Amino acid sequence: VNNMAGPSASFSGVAIPGIPFQVAFTNAIAQRDEMDVFHAINGVHRFYQDIDPVWPYLQGFLTAYVSIEETCNAYYWNQTINFYQAGAGCANTGEIQGVVYHEYGHGITEHILGDQGTQGIGEGNSDIIANYITGESIIGRGFYLDNCVTGIRNSENTLQYPEDLNGSIHHDGQIIAGFHWDSWQELQAGLPAEE
């Protein structure tokens, strides 16, 4: 995780093979968005390692940039995930787990499809990854500083293909995300809680 607004977090210690190594982030060595992005990236890795521990994408390298001097957005590009500072009514996007999961999801989509697809496929697939990990249909809850409830998108929706396509990838992506969300809810309803 690289801090674009100042020195990046620094931690040193001795790692011994075969023994878990604890990285103790504190406010003294890192700022909040650095810690939150680091934690969220590791959460995505754990989520997918539980599904497929040897999946090649998880063995790769992903770089994160936080506190970019822009506001109200985040993005994935070329094996990097990038998060903007707070401002203009928006929170620091590196401090919103759902946004971090979503941007990481673009890397997964690119790995599987080779690009982000068309008609919002990359956005919808990235949203549903965040939905699965957070367990809620809202993407980016807390994105707007004056509204910590609705977030930026909701995968629990009634949008349908092709009639609800409007050409905006974030809107159109809600169609496939809605399909996945509804399917996941039905699957969960049919399984015992422990599964």
Please give the residue ranges for each predicted region.
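Post-HExxH zinc-binding segment in Zn-dependent metallohydrolases
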Residues: 119-161
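Acidic/polar low-complexity interaction segments
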Residues: 1-50, 54-62, 66-88, 110, ...
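Active-site recognition of the HExxH zinc-binding catalytic motif
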Residues: 98-111, 123-127, 131
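Catalytic cores of large soluble enzymes that bind and process phosphate-bearing ligands
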Residues: 29-36, 92, 121, 168, ...
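Surface-exposed patches in mature extracellular/periplasmic domains of secreted proteins
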Residues: 52-66, 115-121, 137-145, 191-195
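Short pre-active-site segment immediately N-terminal to the catalytic Zn-binding motif
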Residues: 35, 83-100, 113-117
